Amino acid sequence: IKDMTNRISERIAILRKTPHECYLIKSHTFVTYHDEVLPLYRGNVLYEYSPEEIKNQALAGADWTLKYQKENGQFLYYYDAQEDNYVDHEHPERPADNLYYNDLRHCGGIVTLIRAYQLTGDKKYIEGAKKGLDFSVTLTKEHDYNGKTAGYIFYNKKAKLGGTGMILVAMMKYRNETNDKSYDEYIKMY
């Protein structure tokens, strides 16, 4: 079926014409919040979206990303609804002023804002992306490589090739959109 069409509605139509057995499984999902158990009303609902609806949903995600961007340029990384806090359950011992954060996902937030700017031309997105880039610059470590200054992103006591690669992509996308040369030094270093 995957070679015939990418449209879910067409795949369903093909399946309906194909001899097979189907079973309907009914389930319920719940989440705990403080002392309450709350039902979730989500599921895989079949929807067909227009390009405009997809764009609006993407922009709503970018708006949410901006809404939860901190003054230092970081984005909200983790929220625990049960405990109503921002402490990552995999890193519960981190101090409140230094909660766990992921530089790769940070770069994803920057690229999201740049894409929103490309779709709308709204400066709020590119300004948020710049704040995110400025935070990433603070994570840059420099070293000498063959007589030249090279750089990499160092965060959470480690350097990841993907972290440096993603910030390079984000900086280049930002530069292409704004012609702002303020990150050229870092682009060359990475």
Language model regions located:
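Positions within ordered alpha-helical repeat solenoids
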Residues: 67, 115, 138, 142, ...
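Aromatic side chains
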Residues: 75-77, 117, 125, 135, ...
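Solvent-exposed loop and edge beta-strand segments that line ligand/cofactor-binding
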Residues: 46-51, 89-107, 148-167, 177-180
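Well-ordered alpha-helical scaffold segments within catalytic/enzyme domains
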Residues: 36-52, 107-123, 165-180
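Low-complexity, Ser/Thr/Pro/Gly-enriched N-terminal "stalk/linker" regions
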Residues: 1-98, 104, 123, 130-131, ...
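Long, compositionally biased, intrinsically disordered segments
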Residues: 70, 129, 133, 151, ...
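Extracytoplasmic/secreted envelope proteins and their assembly/folding machinery
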Residues: 62, 110-113, 133, 184
